[in-house]
Each structure stands twice: as structure tokens, then as C-alpha cells.
């Protein structure tokens, strides 16, 4: 599990096996294999290092 932070400050644990796509637009958007999108504070590089 990786810990990320939503823009409102809420901490969230995500199963890294569910990550399909990580985009910076300029916010970092995580797209899960379920189709759900989550906007987080961490950069694309931070997510890459966590996975």
C-alpha cells in the first residue's frame, strides 16, 4: 500500500497494483484500473518512488 494525500489534506492508502496511470495536469491525477480518478498533492515522481 502507498500513502497519498488528497488536495483537502485527507490521507489515503492505495493498493499500487490498482494504479493504471499517473498524470501531472498540473495536479497529479491517479487513475485506477477501476476507472476511478484521484487527485493528490504528491508529484508524479513521488508516486513513482513510492511504487
Where are these regions (language model features)?
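A short beta-strand micro-motif
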Residues: 2-6
Amino acid at each position: 500500500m502507498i500513502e497519498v494525500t488528497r488536495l483537502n489534506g485527507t490521507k489515503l492508502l492505495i493498493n499500487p497494483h490498482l494504479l493504471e496511470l499517473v498524470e501531472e495536469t498540473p495536479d497529479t491525477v491517479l487513475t485506477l484500473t477501476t476507472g476511478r480518478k484521484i487527485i493528490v498533492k504528491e508529484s508524479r515522481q513521488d508516486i513513482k518512488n513510492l511504487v
